[in-house]
Every structure is written in C-alpha cells, then in structure tokens.
A protein has these predicted regions:
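Acidic, glycine-rich flexible loop/linker segments
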Residues: 1-28, 143, 150-155, 159-287
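Conserved, well-structured core domains of diverse proteins
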Residues: 1-143
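An amphipathic alpha-helix/helix-turn recognition signal
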Residues: 45, 106, 186-189, 279, ...
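Generic secondary-structure signature for well-ordered alpha-helical cores
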Residues: 48-66, 78-85, 91-98, 109, ...
C-alpha cells in the first residue's frame, strides 16, 4: 500500500480503480536556428490556433458551469494576446535565434516569475500558473502534441501529474469518481473549475502518476487529505465506513441552511463569507452566507496592462451587490503594493514589502487610482447593501485622509447627479498600532474587521513568508488574543460591531472564545459556513 498526503480541493471520499493519464512531454531545448522568419510565423500560427481553442473552451465552460467561470479562458486568451508576451517571444527568436518552442517557454517563464514570487497572496501567486498554461498550450500546438483523456464507461479515479483548466472542463463528472494530481494548489483556475463541477479532488500529493498504478484500486480521502494506492483490507473497510459517514454528514450540513447561527444559550454571531470574485459570491449564497464580510478587490487589478477603468470595477461591485441583496457586501479597497507587482503599478522594489508601501499607503501615493475605485464602489452601493473596508491602517491621520477623499468622491458624483447609496465605513485592524488606538479609531467609523493573518505577523515580528519562522506564526498566542479582545472592547464602547476575517475566524478551537469576548461576526471561506454554523449551534 502506498499513502500520500495532499490538499483537498473539493471534499469527498472516493473508492475505485485508477486511470493514469500521462501527457507527452514537449521537447524544450535552447537550440539555435537560422530560419528565423519560419520560426516566427510558426509561433504566430500556433498562437492563432490557441486563440481558437480558448474561444471554444470558453463556450463549453459557459454551458457546463457559468459565464463568470468561463472567463478563465478569456483571461488565458488575454495573456496570450499580451503585447509583452509576444514581444518577449519575438526577442527570443529574432535577437537570440532560439527555436519557437524554446522562445515561447522562455517568455512564459519570465512573465510567470513575476507572479511566482508573490507568496503572501495565493491568488496572485497562482497567476504564474496561468502564464505557464498559456505558454504550454502554444508549445504543444507547435509540436503537434494532442493528448486526450479517454475515460471508460465505468467511473474511475483519474491520477495524473497535473491538469489544466481545459482538461478539467472536458471531464465528464459522471465518469470521474475523483482526480488526484502530483502538483497543483487550492487557488488555481483548475481548482476553481473543479469545485464548480463538484468533482472530488486531491492535489499536490508529490507522488508521480506512474503507469504501473493503472488499474489498481485506490482510495481518495479528500476530507482527511490522503491518497491510498492498493489499500489493505482493513483500511479499505474503514474508508468505506468513512465514506458513508461523510455522505450522511453532508446531508446533515444541508439542514443548516436557513437556520440561525446561535449557541444553545441563545448567543448569536454573524457568519459571512470571504470572496475574491463575482463567482465566489454565488458560492457564498449557495452556502447560506449571511453576507460578504470581505470582498478582496485585487482580482480586478491583475493580469492586465493598466488599472481597471471605473466602469469595469462598477460592473463587478454591482454584480456582487445584486447577487447578495439584501445581504451586505463589505468591499476591501485595494490591498496591493511593492510585493504584488504589475508593470503598470510603477512601484519601486522594496527590501521588505510587508513593511512597505502597500494597501492604504499605496493608495495615498496614487490618489487618482484610489478615487476611481471609490467612485465605482459608491455607484454600486445604489444596487445593494455595501460597506467599504480600508486596510493596513496605523494612524488617525490616515483615516482623516480617507474621509477627505470620500467627500471629494461624493461631491463629484452628486454634481454629475449619479445615484449612490450610503455605504458604511470600516477599518481593518491588522496592525498592533491600529489595535492599540482602536478606542480612537472606533469614534471615526461604523465597524471594524480584524485581519488576524497580518496582525499575527506584525505582532510576533515573524515574516509569514519565512518558512523557518512557521512555528512562530501562532494566532493562538496570548498577545494576539489580547489585542483582539482589546479591539472588541474598544469597539463596543463606541457601539460599533467587530468582525474577524483572518484564517482563525474558521478555527473551531477559538469559536467559543470569540463568542465569549463578544465578537459580532466571523467571515470565513464559503465552504466553511455550514460546518461552523453547526459547530456554533452545539456550543453553550
């Protein structure tokens, strides 16, 4: 028996025979060539074919999932048609005399490396995978490689090194019990599509999909995060019981839809969702979120050549507001900086970006960018219940500056007779400074949201990107809990509510403590809402 551990993309337990899918590896070597024009034309032809394929895949995805999720393929097409990508390929061929396949590979890697370094933002980090997928698509067309997943009639466990979004959207869920990959992550476009299709999946197992595993019995435990090849009888019978229990528990969780989130003694706490896109809002609604506690707006600024125009931002915010109405949507303003580089940001590289010009500091340096976002949010507020959340606050003067810009934006919109709502204004409490002056800050705004990920990093003086300091990243640390409690007390003294939106919001070990100290709301991934509601309803 072989056991491997991985990341659970879509929870479930599957038992069945393995189907190995191995792709033909493209030949990538830096061979020099003399037929430069032929190589360039070959690239252009392959690029045109890739555009055609992506258009077809978008149409297929619209039928199988949704228009919003089909945008994944539009994003890939946009990357493919990125002038920087084409210019990089041209330089590799025309200036460095490399063959077309290597030129595409090199151009893709160079662009991917920009995003691959953004370890503190999983969403941005995963865009490196998109560039590599796009480059790989063109290379496979250049080399006439056409691997197809041939699924048998009887459902199987698909095991492969990796799957692209195109391969996932091509799967027939009725023939796939689950899939397992050697590589992968929770935030990739592949993972997003997988969750939409409802296919049980485990990724990043680090075990190669070898031909000798084909046809063997396997167990995918995408609840406990384990993959078993050729399990023994005891494990198999145990996992069959676990599978039955899991299916029963899923039905049990469905009973939590529509019920109130309160303890046995009647204490109530709000339960909202964290989202990063319009698609996520629909998932939040399906999981009966009481609202959106954190809408990360960064996705609008990624994979593009310039700042998103006001109309595009307005459309996204409006869409989420309408999906969730009358429930609230809290939009966090741009939390981006020197650690999340796009060429158009024009920010200087910083030695320690976590302590640099990020979030509100970035916006203070680029007020027009900030005002554009605020105009879009205020316009969208006419279509739902919207709140605005400002990140990385450390001083009263920053909040005063924010309000001055808000007044300018409101005056501009009023002058143009553009209808708006009245968004509530909130602050992220994610620095020790903000927590320590939360009594003063509470006098200025309508609500707080505690970002425990950064609060932990800054309070414990431990860079969360430094793997050697992982043991210090302890949100249960007494100092963190004390700052949280202080913030709650100061907020309630001024009659404003407090939410927690960091990772520990979903930590069931701390749920009772949060309720005890008076936290008003927890904002968690949509997939955690029903489980957490059930847990809260079991507490005294």
């Amino acid at each position: 028996m072989i056991k491997a551990e991985g990341l659970c993309v879509q929870k479930g337990i599957a038992i069945g025979k393995i189907l190995i899918f191995q792709k033909t590896k493209p030949r990538i070597v830096p061979d020099k060539v003399t037929d430069l024009e032929d190589q360039w034309n070959a690239f252009l032809d392959a690029k045109a074919e890739a555009v055609r394929e992506l258009t077809q895949m978008r149409e297929k995805a619209e039928d199988k999932v949704s228009k919003e999720q089909a945008m994944i393929f539009s994003v890939h097409r946009m990357l493919l048609e990125d002038p920087d990508f084409e210019a990089a390929v041209r330089e590799e061929i025309k200036q460095r005399h490399h063959n077309a396949s290597y030129a595409v590979y090199r151009a893709g890697e160079d662009l991917a490396s920009i995003f691959a370094g953004m370890k503190d933002n999983p969403y941005l980090n995963e865009r490196a995978v998109d560039f590599r997928d796009v480059a790989n698509r063109v290379i496979r067309i250049l080399q006439h490689l056409d691997d197809e997943i041939k699924l048998p009639e009887e459902p199987v466990i698909l095991f492969t090194d990796d799957l692209t979004p195109q391969e996932v959207i091509g799967l027939d869920p009725s023939r796939v019990l689950a899939f397992v990959t050697t590589n992968g992550s929770l935030n990739s476009h592949t993972a997003i599509l997988t969750r939409s299709l409802g296919i049980t999946a485990l990724v990043d197992t680090k075990v190669r999909a070898l031909p000798e595993y084909n046809g063997l019995l396997a167990v995918v435990d995408a609840v406990g995060g384990c993959f078993y090849i050729d399990p023994d009888k005891d494990l198999l019978s145990g996992m069959m019981r676990e599978q039955k229990a899991f299916l029963a528990s899923q039905k049990d969780l469905e009973q939590m839809i529509g019920v109130s989130t309160k303890t046995l003694s009647g204490k109530r706490i709000g339960l909202c969702a964290n989202i990063s896109s319009v698609v996520d809002a629909k998932r939040a609604l399906r999981n009966d979120a009481e609202g959106i506690g954190l809408f990360r707006s960064e996705f609008l600024y990624l994979n593009r050549q310039n700042y998103p125009p006001e109309e595009e931002q307005f459309a996204a915010y409006k869409a989420v507001a309408q999906i969730m109405a009358p429930k609230k949507v809290i939009i966090r303003t741009l939390d981006i900086g020197a650690d999340k580089q796009n060429a158009y940001f024009q920010t200087e590289k910083e030695e320690n970006p976590a302590l640099g010009s990020r979030a509100i500091r970035f916006c203070m340096k680029k007020p027009e960018v900030f005002k554009t976002q605020l105009r879009a949010i205020y316009r969208a507020s006419a279509f739902g219940t919207i709140g605005i959340l400002f990140p990385m606050i450390v001083s009263v003067s920053e909040v005063e500056w924010i309000f001055s810009v808000i007044e300018e934006v409101k005056a501009e919109l009023k002058q143009k007779k553009i209808k708006t709502g009245s968004p509530k204004i909130g602050l992220m409490i994610e620095t020790p400074a903000a927590a320590l002056i939360s009594d003063r800050l509470a006098e200025m705004v309508d609500f707080f949201s505690i970002g425990t990920n950064d609060l932990t990093q800054y309070t414990l003086a431990a860079d969360r990107m430094n793997a050697s300091l992982t043991s210090l990243q302890d949100p249960h640390h007494a100092a963190i809990l004390k700052l949280i409690e202080m913030t709650v007390q100061n907020a309630h003294a001024k009659n404003i509510p407090v939410a927690i939106c960091g990772e520990i919001a979903a930590d069931s070990e701390l749920t009772a403590y949060f309720i005890q100290i008076g936290v008003d709301e927890l904002s968690v991934p949509a997939s955690q809402i029903l489980f957490l509601r059930k847990w809260i309803r079991s507490l005294e």
